[in-house]
UniProtKB/Swiss-Prot annotation:
GO biological process: activation of immune response; cytolysis; positive regulation of type II interferon production
Role description: This splice variant of HMSD is the precursor of the histocompatibility antigen ACC-6. More generally, minor histocompatibility antigens (mHags) refer to immunogenic peptide which, when complexed with MHC, can generate an immune response after recognition by specific T-cells. The peptides are derived from polymorphic intracellular proteins, which are cleaved by normal pathways of antigen processing.
Protein name listed in UniProt: Minor histocompatibility protein HMSD variant form
Oligomer and partners: ACC-6 forms a complex with MHC HLA-B*4403.
Tissues expressing the protein: Highly expressed in dendritic cells and primary leukemia cells, especially those of myeloid lineage. ACC-6 expression is limited to cells of the hematopoietic lineage.
Amino acid sequence: MEIFIEVFSHFLLQLTELTLNMCLELPTGSLEKSLMISSQVLQIPVANSTKQR
């Protein structure tokens, strides 16, 4: 479980950096869209991991 948390937090960090880098190049209106997309992407692996247990 701890390994999963480390991997997940590392993935979250990379995703946040990627989102911020994208937002610097895009207009501010797309910031909300990219945040919505990233939150949807994060919900999928969490749901899958709970089903596997």
